[in-house]
Curated annotation (Swiss-Prot):
Binding-site positions, IMP: D13, E14, G15, K16, N38, A39, G40, H41, T131, R145, Q226, T241, R305
Native source species: Nitratidesulfovibrio vulgaris (strain DSM 19637 / Miyazaki F)
Predominant cellular place of this UniProt entry's protein: cytoplasm
Protein function: Plays an important role in the de novo pathway of purine nucleotide biosynthesis. Catalyzes the first committed step in the biosynthesis of AMP from IMP.
UniProt xrefs under PANTHER family: ADENYLOSUCCINATE SYNTHETASE
Name of the protein in question: Adenylosuccinate synthetase
Gene from which this protein is expressed: purA
Subunit relationships: Homodimer.
Positions annotated to bind substrate: A301, T302, T303, G304, R305, K306, R307
Length: 428
């Protein structure tokens, strides 16, 4: 397997965890390149379920090296909890296989406090549905060049000085603007230093580790979080995350040249879901939406929030293709559609008196489109036991073929269930 980027093509929750876990078998190093613990990957291995928020799911494969890149924002306490949980399940999480870029920025207690305070002070119409994990405020400090990086955890004097400088501003915001409680330098410093000794042994030069892997002839996978349409620049702004989720950030977020990337896999759920606020043209607030939500067990791995559900949106997918340039599609949760008499695919939008096939770029423009649907026959068959393309029902194959026609990208992997082996490989 060549060097590959795996990214979500919708609004996150596409099933990246399973596909990453599957493809990990053919690679040696897995790199997480953006986001923080505001995303969750769920992987089912035998009778054990693993939910990972920071650590790449490749850690579940013995002998694979997992790297957290400079584009990630790291909550050290969450990292330590995940390490402990995995260790309790006999997973090797030693620093030799799990490394963190020294350049990764650290989520501080005041970031989380600000995240929650801001959301609480917004009107219902302006709330973006933040997870309250401090992701956005941490990225803000990074861009303002006042952030704390992972390397600082090994330098207590520098860390304390940075905390002291940061709290001059953060306390003014927390107390003066939001009416909240202030934080002391000692309390923040002590909270971070309580976990720092467990994080510091994992610090490394991630770029050098990747280069060393390539020099040894090894294959590297770059694992994205969230989805294309939550991208800070290209998503449904302002209802987006705080990082670039598109494939191009695999390079910047891990410190490698884009010319080293060979394949890009877009993970596409067979229908569409979204968590939290924001436009969702194909959302179904009816029996079809309830069916997808209940059969698909659509609850967020990170927040536990019920996901909004709707029909597949090919306009959204074409935009994802344009932004990411995928070489392959991995189609997930196809089995959830079994039992529906008919399926709908949105192929265009009605917008401002005309028909468009590209998403509008005006702020909240997606909230004012009307989907144009194409209807296809569904199927009653249970496809969870299908292992080949030929064993799938004819309507299922037609649905997949239509996705390929609408996106111009081959569906190379088809997931028909949550288990690792419930995947049809069409020439990956």
């Amino acid at each position: 397997m060549s060097n590959v980027v795996v990214m979500g093509a919708q609004w996150g929750d596409e099933g990246k965890g399973k596909i990453v876990d599957l493809l990990t078998r053919k690679c040696d190093v897995i790199v997480r390149f953006q986001g923080g613990n505001n995303a969750g990957h769920t992987v089912l291995v035998g009778d054990k379920q693993y939910i990972l928020h920071l650590i790449p799911s490749g850690i579940l494969h013995p002998g694979k090296k997992c790297l957290i890149g400079n584009g990630v924002v790291l909550d050290p306490a969450v990292f330590c909890r995940e390490v402990e949980t995995l260790r309790d399940k006999d997973v090797d999480v030693s620093p030799a296989r799990l490394m963190i870029s020294r350049k990764a920025h650290v989520i501080m207690p005041y970031h989380k406090a600000l995240d929650v305070a801001r959301e609480c002070h917004k009107t219902n119409e302006s709330k973006i549905g933040t997870t309250g994990r401090g992701i956005g405020p941490c990225y803000e400090d990074k861009m303002s060049r006042i952030g704390i990086r992972a390397a600082d955890l090994a330098m207590p004097e520098l860390l304390r000085a940075k905390i002291e400088a940061a709290l001059l501003e953060k306390n003014a915001l927390l107390a003066g603007l939001y009416g909240g409680e202030t934080m002391t330098v000692d309390a923040v410093f002590d909270e971070v230093m309580a976990v720092a000794p467990r994080v510091v042994p994992h610090l490394a030069d991630v770029t050098a580790e990747i280069e060393a892997a390539w020099a040894a002839g090894q294959h590297v996978m770059f694992e994205g979080a969230q989805g294309t349409h939550l991208d800070i620049d290209h998503g449904t702004y302002p209802f987006v995350t705080s990082s670039n989720t598109v494939s191009g950030n695999a390079s910047a977020g891990s410190g490698i040249a884009p010319t080293r990337l060979d394949r890009i896999v877009a993970i596409v759920k067979a229908y569409t879901t979204r968590v939290g606020a924001g436009p969702f043209p194909t959302e179904q607030l009816n029996e079809a939406g309830d069916y997808l939500q209940q059969k698909g067990h659509e609850f967020g791995a990170t927040t536990g929030r019920k996901r909004r559900c709707g029909w597949l949106d090919a306009v959204v997918l074409r935009e994802a293709v344009r932004l990411n340039g995928p070489t392959d599609i991995a189609l997930t949760k196809l089995d959830v559609l079994s039992g529906l008499k008919e399926l709908k695919i949105c192929t265009a939008y009605e917008y401002q008196g005309g028909t468009i096939t590209v998403a509008p770029q005006e702020q909240n423009g997606m909230a004012h489109v009307t989907p144009v649907y194409e209807t296809m026959p569904g199927w009653d068959d249970d496809i969870t036991g299908c292992t080949t393309w030929e064993s799938l029902p004819a309507p299922t194959r037609a649905y997949i073929a239509r996705i390929e026609e609408l996106t111009g990208v081959r569906v190379s992997l088809v997931s028909v269930g949550p288990e690792r082996d419930q995947t049809i490989n069409r020439g990956w």
